Amino acid sequence: MVKPLPRLRLQGFNNLTKALSFNIYDVCYARTEEERQRYIEYIDEQYDADRLTQILTDVAEIIGANILNIARQDYDPQGASVTILISEEPVIDKKQAGKELISDAVVAHMDKSHITVHTYPETHPQEGIATFRADIDVATCGVISPLKALNYLIESLESDIVIMDYRVRGFTRDVKGKKHYIDHKINSIQHFLAKNVKSRYEMFDVNVYQENIFHTKMHLKDFDLDQYLFEERAKNLSFKERMKIETLLKREIEELFHGRNLSE
């Protein structure tokens, strides 16, 4: 739960911008070119624009935002994108329901409060590795906090590796004229994760407190080969095959987690 600082009396609107960025990876091994293609098709179907729209709509509800507009697109040969514009307050007076309106709130929030997701399925040309990356951004202005959606997003996607960045920008001014550059307590993104999530992942932080920048990356603690095989079971493989595939997968996970290629 996001713990606010003692309530401030503000001069006008809360102008703080809070941005949460996710990169979520699913890693898989598919033995043949045909299996790798079926993996891409499976991911493309599982995370098409309709499914992603539902996930982001749920995020908007969780953080207490109002949806202004939704744009979504499936791509050929694969991938999808969804963008939802949101606001802190309802933008249409109930008395005006059914009438065509151009709300000032829409213009005011279009470049500040939004939720976006883009998907990137891909495969290794020779080694059988296939990955899926979901790139998610939740940016809000005002008192709405994107941190409330952390656990839901991790549980909604096949999250072998999660890389998160959170930053607060701008300032809000109280009635005495003093500027405040953050309006809630935070030492680490980890503090906003549920216990059952933290128990499953190894986590690592890089935080720049004086700049209100917080970075956490994590990967699953337990390695179960069956969870990474596509259309195959570990028991059907020879010991040598299992060791080879396990080595490839662990290397891929480590490289994605650290964001760099390891030396041979």
Swiss-Prot record:
Keywords assigned by UniProt, alphabetized: Autocatalytic cleavage, Decarboxylase, Lyase, Polyamine biosynthesis, Pyruvate, S-adenosyl-L-methionine, Schiff base, Spermidine biosynthesis, Zymogen
Protein name per the record: S-adenosylmethionine decarboxylase proenzyme
GO biological-process terms attached to the record: spermidine biosynthetic process
Pfam name, any one: AdoMet_dc
Site (Cleavage (non-hydrolytic)): 112-113
Involved pathway(s): Amine and polyamine biosynthesis; S-adenosylmethioninamine biosynthesis; S-adenosylmethioninamine from S-adenosyl-L-methionine: step 1/1
Enzyme class: lyase
Family statement drawn from the similarity comment of this UniProt entry: Belongs to the prokaryotic AdoMetDC family. Type 2 subfamily.
Signal sequence region: none
Cofactor: pyruvate
SUBUNIT field: Heterooctamer of four alpha and four beta chains arranged as a tetramer of alpha/beta heterodimers.
Location of the active site: 113 (schiff-base intermediate with substrate), 118 (proton acceptor), 141 (proton donor)
Reaction(s) catalysed (UniProt annotation): S-adenosyl-L-methionine + H(+) = S-adenosyl 3-(methylsulfanyl)propylamine + CO2
Cofactor: binding details: Binds 1 pyruvoyl group covalently per subunit.
Organism for this UniProt entry: Xanthomonas campestris pv. campestris (strain ATCC 33913 / DSM 3586 / NCPPB 528 / LMG 568 / P 25)
Residue positions, PTM Pyruvic acid (Ser): 113
Molecular function (Gene Ontology), one example: adenosylmethionine decarboxylase activity
Functional description taken from the UniProt entry: Catalyzes the decarboxylation of S-adenosylmethionine to S-adenosylmethioninamine (dcAdoMet), the propylamine donor required for the synthesis of the polyamines spermine and spermidine from the diamine putrescine.
Modification after translation: Is synthesized initially as an inactive proenzyme. Formation of the active enzyme involves a self-maturation process in which the active site pyruvoyl group is generated from an internal serine residue via an autocatalytic post-translational modification. Two non-identical subunits are generated from the proenzyme in this reaction, and the pyruvate is formed at the N-terminus of the alpha chain, which is derived from the carboxyl end of the proenzyme.
Domain of life of the native organism: Bacteria
Transmembrane segments: none
Gene Ontology CC: cytosol
SUPFAM superfamilies per record: S-adenosylmethionine decarboxylase
Keyword ATP-binding: no
NCBIfam families associated with the record: SAM_DCase_Eco
EC numbers for this chain: 4.1.1.50
